[in-house]
């Protein structure tokens, strides 16, 4: 196993990886404060570099709809990008037709703008973003996920029962889980929080590769898409030229807000209960 960077601890694996406990779940009540912080941070966020107008498709989390990603999409539009909602109502899992519609949306955005598309996914939406980028590498500019559990067993989250109920799917196929762990070929960023009350944070760690990274912030799972630190990192990542992509720089004042990145040396898997 690769030694983790100095100042970090290796993430728990196997039986040690469990869903967040009651205290972290209680901390999810801070989400409204993160929305308020987004408003308060507007002058700071307005100083970020303008975007180049390229299309950005945003996928909502499990049980959520485009309403939850509206603040993020408004932020992206103000920064000069061309954001797209997924327009499929509530995200109740990859039920029949859902992924086909997502694929079509990305293709249409790419053709309309004549350039590749950045894909942003919150929680389960990040799974869609990653998988579509793998299927359509010719259309994917970059992938950014927010609290997405792509690297661990579904039972290392507090949403797995709800997922099974609304989607009608049981995720115990090891081949499928292995597929989810693989990063897309394009630059791929995972924004995660150790205080996430829904997803065990090691489930959101990209394995170490030249085109992957993990950016740690202090955020709730439910408020991550409105958290000013997440928005800042998203804008920074979208402004990167894929041809000369570099990992998120946490030198200077950023060290006060972002943690030393952790890169998983190997896929993180929890034993099924």
Predicted regions and their residues:
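Helical cap/lid subdomain of alpha/beta-hydrolase-fold lipid enzymes
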Residues: 134-273
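Serine-dependent carboxylesterase/thioesterase catalytic core
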Residues: 54-67, 71, 75-186, 191, ...
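Flexible, membrane-associating and regulatory peripheral segments of lipid-active enzymes
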Residues: 1-56, 69, 74, 79, ...
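Phosphate-binding glycine-rich loops and adjacent basic patches that engage nucleotide phosphates
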Residues: 30-39, 60-69, 189-200
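Hydrophobic alpha-helical segments, principally membrane-spanning helices and signal/leader peptides
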Residues: 13, 45-46, 106, 132, ...
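Generic preference for well-ordered secondary structure
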Residues: 9, 13-16, 20, 40-46, ...
């Amino acid at each position: 196993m690769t030694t983790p960077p100095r100042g970090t601890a290796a993430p728990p694996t196997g039986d040690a990886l469990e869903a967040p406990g009651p205290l972290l779940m209680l901390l999810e009540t801070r989400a409204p404060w993160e929305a308020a912080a987004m408003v308060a941070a507007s002058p700071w966020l307005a100083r970020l570099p303008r975007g180049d107008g390229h299309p950005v498709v945003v996928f909502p989390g499990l049980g959520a709809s485009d309403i939850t990603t509206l603040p993020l999409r408004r932020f992206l539009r103000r920064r000069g990008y061309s954001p797209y909602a997924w327009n499929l109502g509530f995200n109740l899992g990859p039920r029949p037709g859902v992924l086909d519609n997502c694929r079509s949306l990305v293709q249409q955005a790419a053709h309309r703008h004549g350039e590749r598309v950045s894909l942003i996914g919150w929680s389960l939406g990040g799974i869609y973003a990653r998988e579509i980028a793998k299927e359509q590498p010719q259309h994917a500019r970059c992938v950014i996920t927010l609290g997405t559990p792509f690297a661990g067993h579904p039972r290392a989250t507090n949403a797995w029962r709800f997922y099974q109920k609304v989607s009608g799917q049981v995720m115990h196929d090891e081949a499928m889980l292995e597929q989810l762990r693989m990063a897309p070929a394009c630059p791929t960023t995972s924004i995660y929080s150790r205080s996430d009350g829904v997803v065990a944070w090691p489930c959101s760690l990209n394995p170490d590769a030249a085109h992957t990274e993990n950016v740690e912030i202090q955020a709730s799972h439910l408020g991550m898409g409105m958290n000013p630190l997440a928005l800042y990192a998203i804008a920074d990542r979208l402004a990167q030229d894929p041809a000369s992509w570099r990992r998120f720089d946490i030198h200077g004042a950023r060290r006060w807000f972002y943690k030393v990145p952790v890169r998983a040396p190997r896929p993180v898997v929890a034993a099924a209960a």
